[in-house]
Structure formats: C-alpha cells, structure tokens
Amino acid sequence: MNLSEIKAALLERNMFAPVAIPVACYLVYKLLRMGSREKTLPPGPPTKPVLGNLHQMPAMNDMHLQLSKWAQEYGGIYSLKIFFKNVVILTDSASVTGILDKLNAKTAERPTGFLPAPIKDDRFLPIALYKSDEFRINHKAFKLLISNDSIDRYAENIETETIVLMKELLAEPKEFFRHLVRTSMSSIVAIAYGERILTSSDPFIPYHEEYLHDFENMMGLRGVHFTALIPWLAKWLPDSLAGWRVMAQGIKDKQLGIFNDFLGRVEKRMEAGIFDGSHMQTILQKKEELGFKDRDLIAYHGGVMIDGGTDTLAMFTRVFVLMMTMHPECQQKIRDELKEVMGDEYDSRLPTYEDALKMKYFNCVIREVTRIWPPSPIVPPHYSTEDLEYDGYFIPKGTVIVMNLYGIQRDPKVFDAPDEFRPERYMESEFGTKPGVDLTGYRHTFTFGAGRRICPGLKMAEIFKRTVSLNIIWGFDIKPLPNSPKSMKDDVVVPGPVSMPKPFECEMVPRSQAVVQVIHEVADY
C-alpha cells in the first residue's frame, strides 16, 4: 500500500468517526441506564445498574410476601425493573380498577412468556393472547355458562355432589381432604362433561393431582417467572439452567391427554344418541357457529374448567374447614342462623343454596375465608399493549402488570388485624374494611381476576362455596384435636400458584341422629 492509499484509508475512517463516537457513547449510556427506573414510573425499591431489582426477587412461592412488604413502603401501585423490563405491581383496589378494569382494552393481554414453552399455548384460555382468535372463540363459548338455565343446573349438580360428600364424611370423616377434592372435581366434570366422579378412590383424582403438583413445582422454581419478563433469554438458556423446560413438556402431554380423554367420551355418547345437556355437548353442537376449527382447542376449552376450578374450590372448602377448626364458635352462630331460615325443616332436609343466600352471618364467614387466604395469592400477570397514564404515572407499552391479591386482602391500612379471622368485620362494613377507608373500586370478586380476564366460572364457584360449606356445618360439629393448628401463624398453608392448606387433623362428628338419618335417606334415594 503506497502513501496515497494510506492517506485515503485514514481519511475514510475519519469520515465515520463523527458518527461512530456518538453512537458508541449512546450505547454505553443505554447499557448503564439499563435497570434504572424512569421518573415517570410509579416509585419502587432502589435499583442496581443493569440488574434493576433482579437481585431482590424471591422464589415464586414467597413472591406474594415480598410484594406485599414493598407495597407497605412504596404504596398501592409501585414499579420494579428487571434489566430493561418494567413491572408494575397493583396492591390496592383503586389501581386494579383504574388500570385492569377501566383500561381493560389496553391491559387484557398476557406476557408472551407467561408460561414456559411448551406449556404456553393460545388454546389454553388463561394464557391465550387477548387479541387471538382462540381467546375470542373461548370467551364467546363461555358466555353459554352464565345463562339462567346453566346457573340452575349448577345448583342442581352441586347439591347432588354435596349429598355424596355428606355420605362420605359420615363413613370416613378423617379423609375429608380427599372427599372435598372429589366433590369439587365431580361438580365441575358433571357441568362440563355430563360425567361424575363417584368415589374419592377414582384413579383420575391422583392422576390429575400429580399433574397439577408437577405444574406447581415447576412454577415454584427460582427463575421460571422471569420467562414472563425476558422470554428471549429463557429461550436461549441451556437446559441445565432452565430445568422447567423438561418438566413443561411432561405437564403439557398429561394435560392434553386428560382433556382429550374427556372430550372423546362426550363425542361417543353423542354418537350413541345420548344427550345430557352438558356444556361440552353444547359446544360440540355449536362448534361451527362459535368458530371452533381445532379439536385440541375444544379439548382445552373443557379442560380449563377442570384445571381452573378443581384445586381452587377444594382449596376454599379446606380453608373453610380449617377456619371452623380454629374457630368453633363460628359454627354455632351459623347453625343458629340456619335454624331461623329453615324453621321446622332444620332437622328434616339438607340446606340449599337458596337457604345460604338468606343468611347474613354465614355469608360474612364465606367472605372472610376468601379474604384470609385467596386460592391464588398473585393473579396471573397482565401486559400493556399501549402506553397508558394512571394517577399521574406513565406506564409504557410492554409493561408487565401484576395484581397482588394477597397484599390487597391483607393490607393493614385497609383491614383491622388483617391476619386474624374475623367474619364480624363484614357485619360492620360491606367489605370488612376500617372506617374511613377509601373504597374506590373495591369489590368482592377480586379473587376471580380483573378486566377482560375475569374468571367465567365466578357464579358456579359462589354457588359451590356456599352450598358445600353450609351443608358441612349443618351436618357436622367440627372439633379441634390436640395436633390441630391453632392459628394462621402455625404455617398451615403451602404457598404456590394455588395455595393449599397443609393436611391437618380435626374431628367431624354428626350433629345429631336426625342428621344421620336425613343423609342416609337422600343418599340412598
């Protein structure tokens, strides 16, 4: 290379220098700013460069506790930074209503990495993308569940399963944990598929519980929840650092196998000319009208009812029995109120959902059980698809939005002694809150989600909770044993995506011989 060529090369490099230097400086600046909270976001815990708040994030099973602790320090709406990602935590009713309910068109989406591949699938409604055809079809189909005729069938099916439960509790009172699972599962399967789980020894129960247990273990792994925040990073991690991947494939296979087995039996009954009016028969009859083109999508539609309802309903009734074990004085108050409602029929028939609706104190108990420990302490995350403003904050497009239900329902600024079981708080105010508390947006249905993601099984769940719980108290005196938990501080609940009480002991004694006779009469009818 001669001297002129060298000069030309240096000149060419110098031409790019004015551009390259600012670009390099900008990239360095962006890297250093990664993890820093923008001033327009809600406040939050201090961040570290690049990491943001990543170093402070606990395991999933403890997440609700840390999020609630931060809420007491930074307020009902605050933000976290995970690298470049924004996460907004909602821990008061006003922000949930203002962001997830009122701005639902902008916040109905799920993060694309909410669950790790291969579980994530738009055919599974809880995680389906809001703007997908799958979500639209499922949402339309679930509207068939909330018709007046459907609601009447819920009550009938649940009362039928409650009769079986009462007989099981007479025969095997110590096995109430298993019997409550059968009752919730059979109620849902009957409504969805026209089938019943007749005994607590049915092999489907442990198979389904094993699959859900695997799912909860996977979701409890440290790091798995970052797939919602940094899906591209999770994709490239080796299996040694992403142990949930292998677990996810096994879970997906079991899940779809269960759903297709149930759907196949419905199809066979229809081919044989047997029509039972179940929800899935209605779906198959109207699948073209509803837009179902994929058989797996139909299978998932029914399956989400099993997965979404069995554990949550069983969890509620187990917590109810636990609270009655810890607070036996509540039982007699419920019976006294029920006696007034049923009158002369008190010892001659089982109570119904209609009876439950007339009972003020009993409904306070139901609400307090729901408040003291919700089935899912943290609601599955939402995702903003547009920029939005709330209460002076700017929340940019692409923000993960988390509703901390545990923190909302255990907020000491809202509830007196929030960790104590006090049904009477609902006798004093509609939502059991302290006098003078701002109740903007408060409602009894936070446990079912918010916005356009609210659970379509809300009505069925309310019927189930009241019918099953009231019958248990009508029929049995629940007595603590020496090893029974004494309070919620006794570490009685296993945390996780669905927080089940740990197995505990109590004694269930029939209230009278008349009760035993009534149960046998209706069970043998």
From Swiss-Prot:
Superkingdom classification of source: Eukaryota
EC class name: oxidoreductase
Residues modified by glycosylation: N2, N148
Alphabetical UniProt keywords: Glycoprotein, Heme, Iron, Membrane, Metal-binding, Monooxygenase, Oxidoreductase, Transmembrane, Transmembrane helix
Pathway participation: Secondary metabolite biosynthesis; terpenoid biosynthesis
Subcellular location: Membrane
Enzyme Commission number(s) of this protein: 1.-.-.-
Record's bilayer topology term: Single-pass membrane protein
Transmembrane segments: 15-32
Function: Cytochrome P450 monooxygenase; part of the gene cluster that mediates the biosynthesis of pleuromutilin, a tricyclic diterpene showing antibacterial properties. The geranylgeranyl diphosphate (GGPP) synthase ple4 catalyzes the first step in pleuromutilin biosynthesis. GGPP is then substrate of the premutilin synthase (PS) ple3 to yield premutilin. Premutilin synthase is a bifunctional enzyme composed of the fusion of a class II diterpene cyclase (DTC) and a class I diterpene synthase (DTS), with the corresponding domains and active sites containing characteristic aspartate-rich motifs.
Stated name of the protein: Cytochrome P450 monooxygenase ple6
Organism name: Rhodocybe pseudopiperita
Taxon lineage: Eukaryota, Fungi, Dikarya, Basidiomycota, Agaricomycotina
